[in-house]
Amino acid sequence: SYGYDEKGGISVPGPMGPSGPRGLPGPPGPGPQGFQGPPGEPGEPGSSGPMGPRGPPGPPGKNGDDGEAGKPGRPGERGPPGPQGARGLPGTAGLPGMKGHRGFSGLDGAKGDAGPAGPKGEPGSPGENGAPGQMGPRGLPGERGRPGASGPAGARGNDGATGAAGPPGPTGPAGPPGFPGAVGAKGEAGPQGARGSEGPQGVRGEPGPPGPAGAAGPAGNPGADGQPGAKGANGAPGIAGAPGFPGARGPSGPQGPSGPPGPKGNSGEPGAPGSKGDTGAKGEPGPTGIQGPPGPAGEEGKRGARGEPGPTGLPGPPGERGGPGSRGFPGADGVAGPKGPAGERGSPGPAGPKGSPGEAGRPGEAGLPGAKGLTGSPGSPGPDGKTGPPGPAGQDGRPGPPGPPGARGQAGVMGFPGPKGAAGEPGKAGERGVPGPPGAVGPAGKDGEAGAQGPPGPAGPAGERGEQGPAGPGFQGLPGPAGPPGEAGKPGEQGVPGDLGAPGPSGARGERGFPGERGVQGPPGPAGPRGNGAPGNDGAKGDSQGAPGLQGMPGERGAAGLPGPKGDRGDAGPKGADGAPGKDGVRGLTGPIGPPGPAGAPGDKGESGPSGPAGPTGARGAPGDRGEPGPPGPAGFAGPPGADGQPGAKGEPGDAGAKGDAGPSGPAGPTGPPGPIGNVGAPGPKGARGSAGPPGATGFPGAAGRVGPPGPSGNAGPPGPPGPVGKEGGKGPRGETGPAGRPGEVGPPGPPGPGEKGSPGADGPAGAPGTPGPQGISGQRGVVGLPGQRGERGFPGLPGPSGEPGKQGPSGSSGERGPPGPVGPPGLAGPPGESGREGAPGAEGSPGRDGSPGPKGDRGETGPGPPGAPGAPGAPGPVGPAGKNGDRGETGPAGPAGPAGPAGARGPAGPQGPRGDKGETGEQGDRGIKGHRGFSGLQGPAGPPGSPGEQGPSGASGPAGPRGPPGSAGSPGKDGLNGLPGPIGPPGPRGRTGDAGPVGPPGPPGPPGPPGPP
């Protein structure tokens, strides 16, 4: 046969000798990269395998934002007025109570042993993106929960960002005048001067303080009247007096506006889980307060200014409950009126007999909204109530505007080459070329037998082949990013066949072979798009409450913008540096207070204000009528242990929830890099029972009962709606190294690098042995697949990027020398073959099974080590001109098997398995009697491992892949416009009078006084 030698000469066929060893493939040619072929037809989705074992729960997510508050309900019909009560005695104002600590969370149960893992199923095809759901109706407000027992104070949180400085407060009143300074020493009398000319009359000065009387001198002889002396020089200023006391503290200035929030800090590393504290001792129940008389029901009218509270009346007989009325529209919220003076506290009356609950009255028609009252002074916030049961999950909101394009992902792993097509017929011999220099090639082998034709894939539509341009003078560029798959081109017209014979007919498609052995783990793929995260477990309680901000005006909900058309994908630029936070906007001027507008849409929830002191414990009121059942509130934290209740009867089973429609499968994103293995979160609390009726109005807290024996477990209700998407958890600590993976098969040899072969270097010194890595947790052994048919050798990939130079390893043992082949005469290089026709792209192979993660081996020492495991396939190189198919040579003698390379790095996490079918609904149980809230149970012993579940049918499409890496930081936004002035806050409490300040410095000396009388 004809061919090229390494020097580029032509070889002519010589005498046929025995087959030499197969040469290495040459480096890639300098030709331009060919166009990407049309994508092949997608393969049939594989049937779903058995469900794998459930993974450990993820780390707890951060607490979600509180939901919007519901609109207040309408007041019921007014009951008959009770008799006028006697005026009570004035009560003393109670001291404000302290805010209670949050109650303990329930103790987590012990984690059960994991059951044996079922065989891993093949990943299901991704579903299409579902249409955006409509916004659900707004939930009604849940009833206020009772305050929980005080929990231990949380650890101090990190200091928040410093807010902008507020405006300076008003100047305080002037302090008291300082003490007068000490009198200076009397100066000596100067000599009498000559009489000066009389000057103009001076301004009369303020009288100075009288000086101390001097000692009486001896009486002198009366002298003659002398001339008036000249005006003496001003005396030296006296010694400064002691500083005065500080003035009284002025009233506190108005609170400045809250500064703009500081930039969000980086997420801290998750702390190690704290040790579980001991269960506290059960506290003694507090005394039951005296039940006060119920006040008369107010008449429903227009909401006006708040009047002074009237005297407390005696409890009247409970009226009959009216029938339900037609439900009116909720009126607009009026502004709270000014707080009236507190009425005198009456003496508590005797507790009346508890009346039977009346029938539910019909809610009255909604009154017209009253005029906007004046802003009242803020009341003291009450103790925090317990969080109510979770409300119904709202429907998915409208999709937001498209975000900025993400950063360019990593280059994907080169796909495996398709099956080799059938060998074409040999072309006609070319003209004999000029004999070149003798090459280093071995003798040509004799024609081998043609191998069995592999099953060709379904041929995709062949695109029109463009004319190949001349090779450019530049260097070969790096492979660009993979563009979006183009639409399949129309089948091109059959071209004129060249000198080459047409390829043989395609054989029938063979049956699907058994899965091959698990290959070596490839490098991690590019980052996938951001997936819809599953709800995380409740996170740990955050740091202590930060400083409260001012309550902002509720903004109007903006209309959802229409999603814009998808733009062309641009070239990914380098990741920019994090932009600096924008400048603080200038504070706008306070505008005039306008008339009350209509009820606005519910605004975003403002930041919680500072907790005020708890008010005094009020007298216990009479039991009220049973209210309408309210909607379920959000799920509360586990309260303190309650008294033992009576064993409840077996509850009724919940209604089986309807199975949701499977959403359309979204486009499959590229596999993201493996994230760090987070801590295994503690098992979350048991979900609330589904399909529970709305709770009634809040009753008075009863006395603590005894702890009863635990009742029988009720049947499990239907699963609740999925919770909101949890915030992204912090980066978890690195997991332990897994067991060593099996050595993979030796891959095809890569192309030789440019340059001549250098002489072998001297052996370096042997390095010290590395420290052994930590013992990994032994993984469960997967199902061993049947060995598949050995595939044909693929095309060699481009040389991958050079890795970090390894340390010098110990010199490998010399392999056994193979039998030397007979050296044949050097043949002349044959003429260059003509370009063959481009074959149709092969079918996409079925995805291989995930390899078991291997431990990361110790870094080897530098120097020539044993041959390593085959590297990951390089990026696809440019398509060179198709060469002429040569005759297949005989198989050369097998070389010595290289030692197994080190185990590859841990592969990316596999896709999430399909969701199993919903279990059958249990039989209906009897409705249980509502018992007292029991104590949170102590941690029970670990249960026995459960039996592996049976393989369910194919579930719905799995969720989207793991969240990709964060996109490049956007440029800082423009400075915001001046915001609307916020409402004038209520006046703050009057500050206390400050302590007297130090004595101020003495004032300047006054002008000299007028001369005294003679």
From Swiss-Prot:
<feature type="compositionally biased region" description="Low complexity">
    <location>
        <begin position="608"/>
        <end position="622"/>
    </location>
</feature>
<feature type="modified residue" description="4-hydroxyproline">
    <location>
        <position position="491"/>
    </location>
</feature>
<feature type="modified residue" description="4-hydroxyproline">
    <location>
        <position position="363"/>
    </location>
</feature>
<feature type="modified residue" description="4-hydroxyproline">
    <location>
        <position position="39"/>
    </location>
</feature>
<feature type="modified residue" description="4-hydroxyproline">
    <location>
        <position position="563"/>
    </location>
</feature>
<comment type="subunit">
    <text>Trimers of one alpha 2(I) and two alpha 1(I) chains.</text>
</comment>
<feature type="glycosylation site" description="O-linked (Gal...) hydroxylysine; alternate">
    <location>
        <position position="930"/>
    </location>
</feature>
<feature type="compositionally biased region" description="Pro residues">
    <location>
        <begin position="999"/>
        <end position="1014"/>
    </location>
</feature>
<feature type="compositionally biased region" description="Pro residues">
    <location>
        <begin position="864"/>
        <end position="879"/>
    </location>
</feature>
<feature type="modified residue" description="5-hydroxylysine; alternate">
    <location>
        <position position="930"/>
    </location>
</feature>
<dbReference type="Pfam" id="PF01391">
    <property type="entry name" value="Collagen"/>
</dbReference>
<feature type="compositionally biased region" description="Low complexity">
    <location>
        <begin position="691"/>
        <end position="707"/>
    </location>
</feature>
<feature type="modified residue" description="4-hydroxyproline">
    <location>
        <position position="381"/>
    </location>
</feature>
<feature type="modified residue" description="4-hydroxyproline">
    <location>
        <position position="623"/>
    </location>
</feature>
<feature type="region of interest" description="Disordered">
    <location>
        <begin position="1"/>
        <end position="1014"/>
    </location>
</feature>
<feature type="modified residue" description="4-hydroxyproline">
    <location>
        <position position="1002"/>
    </location>
</feature>
<feature type="modified residue" description="4-hydroxyproline">
    <location>
        <position position="841"/>
    </location>
</feature>
<feature type="modified residue" description="4-hydroxyproline">
    <location>
        <position position="81"/>
    </location>
</feature>
<feature type="modified residue" description="4-hydroxyproline">
    <location>
        <position position="503"/>
    </location>
</feature>
<feature type="modified residue" description="4-hydroxyproline">
    <location>
        <position position="760"/>
    </location>
</feature>
<feature type="modified residue" description="4-hydroxyproline">
    <location>
        <position position="147"/>
    </location>
</feature>
<feature type="modified residue" description="4-hydroxyproline">
    <location>
        <position position="315"/>
    </location>
</feature>
<feature type="modified residue" description="4-hydroxyproline">
    <location>
        <position position="981"/>
    </location>
</feature>
<dbReference type="InterPro" id="IPR050938">
    <property type="entry name" value="Collagen_Structural_Proteins"/>
</dbReference>
<feature type="modified residue" description="Phosphoserine">
    <location>
        <position position="611"/>
    </location>
</feature>
<feature type="modified residue" description="5-hydroxylysine">
    <location>
        <position position="575"/>
    </location>
</feature>
<feature type="modified residue" description="4-hydroxyproline">
    <location>
        <position position="261"/>
    </location>
</feature>
<dbReference type="InterPro" id="IPR008160">
    <property type="entry name" value="Collagen"/>
</dbReference>
<feature type="compositionally biased region" description="Gly residues">
    <location>
        <begin position="319"/>
        <end position="328"/>
    </location>
</feature>
<feature type="compositionally biased region" description="Pro residues">
    <location>
        <begin position="167"/>
        <end position="179"/>
    </location>
</feature>
<feature type="modified residue" description="5-hydroxylysine">
    <location>
        <position position="918"/>
    </location>
</feature>
<feature type="modified residue" description="4-hydroxyproline">
    <location>
        <position position="674"/>
    </location>
</feature>
<feature type="modified residue" description="4-hydroxyproline">
    <location>
        <position position="548"/>
    </location>
</feature>
<feature type="modified residue" description="3-hydroxyproline">
    <location>
        <position position="986"/>
    </location>
</feature>
<feature type="modified residue" description="4-hydroxyproline">
    <location>
        <position position="581"/>
    </location>
</feature>
<keyword id="KW-0272">Extracellular matrix</keyword>
<feature type="modified residue" description="3-hydroxyproline">
    <location>
        <position position="1007"/>
    </location>
</feature>
<feature type="modified residue" description="4-hydroxyproline">
    <location>
        <position position="405"/>
    </location>
</feature>
<protein>
    <recommendedName>
        <fullName>Collagen alpha-1(I) chain</fullName>
    </recommendedName>
</protein>
<feature type="modified residue" description="4-hydroxyproline">
    <location>
        <position position="535"/>
    </location>
</feature>
<feature type="modified residue" description="4-hydroxyproline">
    <location>
        <position position="285"/>
    </location>
</feature>
<feature type="modified residue" description="4-hydroxyproline">
    <location>
        <position position="799"/>
    </location>
</feature>
